């Protein structure tokens, strides 16, 4: 693509309005427009750009995060057969800071920085591909993340209540949010509700809930721990019991929501025909998180561009003939974190000394032997995983475990 043959439109996206700035290949500002974020008003943008485009050149639109507030506009522009590029926020911010002697912050300045980033990185920026399937998958993944955050807060609140009502609660329930534990807190929010309960009574009640996993020994442990705590019945215990019951009810609700979301995620994963779960250590949840961030793999022409998008490609810094590779601070942080966490999981070794993934572990040890730190070796694994994931998504192939002797060459 010859840059002189295009004009560039950078669009700063917001919930209610968008601001667009048009520049030419020499970074001369040609025009600006602010328009509502409604499909009925999108033609105003094209009309304004046509007035600025006196030489009838091709137009390239750069959208900062084309999968959020700008998704309807990206879909509309693509349907009109325009070139649409997805500009990472970190890239446009860097352009804004280096544009002049004084850093300015406004919608117009941001839009101009996005246009400049589109001009300077025309061949490196990924095409915007707001596919409905991947967008819906991303919505489900974000919903699941929000549910898990809320659930974690509720579990912490439940810990706060239980440490007063049952000081030794960790002796009989290691996981206080599993179904059996939630049933117990729901029916026995404080020790006064256990008065008169025998071991057999408690076992008869908990066995069906735990699917026959709650033994007589566990029930004895519960009653013995409660008796040994010698907790006095404090004033206003009923009010605190109500708080416990409310937290348990919320946890049960979120667990139900989580099960529904996970079921839908599994259905969508199968519908997309993905093969990422054939990689050892990758389950459906990890796979859909990766898919939601990458989107349509066709928008990346090679694995290097995907690595750059994820912020995993090393950045080379050098001066006077000396240099080193460092981790970049740009890219999709969510995708980067998912891949890095996956790399950590794949190099783990069991208590018996058996590696979870012998090939990845051998590659990790090879990099460590070359003098790299653990973090640098994990980044190397992350970069290899990006290439593996790219090839699998591009070709629809399953993961094939290579021979350990060749692990230093490929994963």
Q: Which residues does each predicted region cover?
A:
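A detector of single, family-specific signature residues
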Residues: 1-411
